[in-house]
């Protein structure tokens, strides 16, 4: 049976259909917002997966190019691997949902959101989060807490709910808020240096607007939701938990109180070895349960240290940032390099400048078709002292790269001001927490070292949270290290400048964040950010005055759009000759803006001169130095500008009578000529006689 339910959100219809499609899925819904439509299917395995200590949730965000009326480019005319944006959207769906499943639930769960229709005014990634929550709530899977997602824009001082395409262009803020009835589950934001109080108010606005969508989901569940299955939840057997606690708790507590990371890890390795030796014969089939019990006790000790003893694992104050180190200019041949160190976290970012032709072309369902500034993040195994095969970037690397990219995007100079494609690559050399925000700092250093005139330096910091089990006690931590991230409840990343916030990303492991935690995290991040920015400015106070000598040389010129065809020529003949003769790269925009770049400045100058000649208009009354291209009985043809020839009649060749043209000029001669007339057919009439006369008069006056 087909069930439908509908509501209005921000003046546009939101509708869910259940029971019509995907009959063999546990739940399959078609959810629409305006003309944007997402097909969402959710399924779970019948039995828990054995031998694991995590919840195996898989979220897939599938883009279909037919949703925007496109056929995939390239030789193979079908969708390939997910785009970076699809991967990021899949992560954004996963993050608010994962903490809301029952603790100990180990069944495989798969959520597949397929984008089947897109209207640019209504973003599919926002609808997909709502659709995933709706499908899970309607299914028999034990997920019972609806999650809603909205986007918040800011135009002037007004917050806009789910802004349209035009409003997004005008908005200085792109904020996604995911929430339950009680708390905020996830935040993603990019902004043009948004003040802290404005950001907090925007998050509150988004939280309030989520409530209408939560109500919509609850109504649908009450009307046609499936009965929930009773889950088989994994729990460490009480006998094992008590035995491990009695044997090892004091040793674990003593080890976790060691402030030095390496000494603490070595001590814990010894404790784990003793635990294994003690219990592997008695409980040979329960070693994973023993490992889980040890993890729970480590977490318990860390929470007690922070909430009851007021101590951090490394001895810092709750609002203290680790030691900062900044360095630029490390590599001799790169265009810009920044090395940023925060405690045991270290990132080296390298900036490369390229021609405008090297922009990244995007073949996806979004409105953005190309990208001039990009940031890539690499996290090799050696950064944590491990041995693993080197693979391509995973979801985490793509997500961290995009986060650092978003943090600096509002600060990158315009194409007109700085005609380069900019690529940043952050190499994580050592990781002990918050490498994505270290990448923001490293990127700032590299851009300044490369001579990129960014609006202002940016820095990033990760804030953490430790709570009691009943959430009545909360402590916000500044600059969390790996241990606090691993055992903590929140990763609240904030990047920005001294003027305001440029990006936020928030993940939580608990059932949401209170308003107080969000406020304290945002203002705590500002205090830390300003301190880090001071360190960056001490290292390099402003962008280099010139780009690296190894960077391409570029020049821009504006031509009449009607003249573009003259520069390109039939079949690209003219532009290809310029490129071949000068060794440059040429990019021409529709508005007539021309970018010329090359490794050598001489080639750029020569190409610019040729293009100016091709596009310059011949004017009557002007004198030109032209080249004789052809001789006829009645006169000489002279090229006054590239591809622009005129005729000097034999009677206009000299002050005296000329019998033969060859007596005065030969092919290849350069002569001064004056344009006497451009007739109605565009023919150019020239006079050498008039040019000589004017030159003689000027000499007399001098």
From Swiss-Prot:
Its main location: cytoplasm. It is found in: Cytoplasm. Residues 621-689 form the S1 motif domain. Mg(2+) binds at residues 485, 491. Signal peptide: none annotated. GO terms for biological process: mRNA catabolic process; RNA processing. Residues 552-611 form the KH domain. One of its GO terms (molecular function) is polyribonucleotide nucleotidyltransferase activity. Its EC number is 2.7.7.8. SMART domains: KH, S1. Keywords: Cytoplasm, Magnesium, Metal-binding, Nucleotidyltransferase, RNA-binding, Transferase. It holds the Pfam family KH_1. The keyword Transmembrane helix does not apply. InterPro entries: ExoRNase_PH_dom1 (IPR001247), ExoRNase_PH_dom2 (IPR015847), ExoRNase_PH_dom2_sf (IPR036345), KH_dom (IPR004087), KH_dom_type_1 (IPR004088), KH_dom_type_1_sf (IPR036612), NA-bd_OB-fold (IPR012340), PNPase (IPR012162). Involved in mRNA degradation. Catalyzes the phosphorolysis of single-stranded polyribonucleotides processively in the 3'- to 5'-direction. HAMAP family: PNPase. Belongs to the polyribonucleotide nucleotidyltransferase family. This is Polyribonucleotide nucleotidyltransferase. The gene is pnp.
